[in-house]
Amino acid sequence: MRIDNRELDQLRTVTFERNYTKHAEGSVLVCFGDTKVLCTASVEAGVPRWLKGKGQGWVTAEYGMLPRATNTRNQREAARGKQSGRTQEIQRLIGRSLRAMVDLTKLGENTIYLDCDVLQADGGTRTASITGAAIALIDALEVLQQKKKLKADPLIGLVAAVSVGVKNGEVLLDLNYEEDSSCDTDLNVVMTQKGEFIEIQGTAEEKPFTRAEADKMLAMAEKGIADLVKLQQTALGW
């Protein structure tokens, strides 16, 4: 039994509240336990310069944390004048993951920005961001279709993400902050709804992990992501 009385392979309570804000084409408040992230999808006509004239669109992401999302206040990155390496890494991960959902050649010369703002952090902010932003992206695509801006549906399928870790020889799913900060090893795994891997980020924090442990972590992540996809589908009314 874990710190919060979950089973080893049990997700935290996961919820999605769609249409959380009124201006964005898609907006979702996603909660993984006490981690809460507001994910908004904004559509803008046009694409980055390096894509102009190629007849395709673009999906990108930005990520940030509110100053008091954590136990002590952090200065806003805008006030510091630059983004941290962590922020840049996470928003690139989110963008890569969400581009796997869309056939960019069917998006037209439109850009969809996914903004993921962490309201409260208790571990797994990047995985919650990906999982919530996937729903916001689908809602934004629906708006484009309703406005007759697309000739064909560009959606390929859902993606979701979850963390796994090894602590005292046991594999744990969906780590909260206390678990994440004390694990021997942790992975962040992103997959499609078909069970294909998009990204695997893994680090041995305290001691190296074996191939057998890696296989166990990936198997547990696969199960967790399948459960997350079902929750996404329920939230979407599919």
Swiss-Prot record:
GO terms for molecular function: 3'-5'-RNA exonuclease activity; tRNA binding; tRNA nucleotidyltransferase activity. One of its GO terms (biological process) is rRNA processing. Phosphate binds at R86, G124, T125, R126. Its EC number is 2.7.7.56. It holds the Pfam family RNase_PH. SUPFAM superfamilies: Ribonuclease PH domain 2-like, Ribosomal protein S5 domain 2-like. It catalyses: tRNA(n+1) + phosphate = tRNA(n) + a ribonucleoside 5'-diphosphate. Keywords: Nucleotidyltransferase, RNA-binding, rRNA processing, Transferase, tRNA processing, tRNA-binding. It is an enzyme of class 2 (transferase). Homohexameric ring arranged as a trimer of dimers. Phosphorolytic 3'-5' exoribonuclease that plays an important role in tRNA 3'-end maturation. Removes nucleotide residues following the 3'-CCA terminus of tRNAs; can also add nucleotides to the ends of RNA molecules by using nucleoside diphosphates as substrates, but this may not be physiologically important. Probably plays a role in initiation of 16S rRNA degradation (leading to ribosome degradation) during starvation. Belongs to the RNase PH family. NCBIfam families: RNasePH. This is Ribonuclease PH.
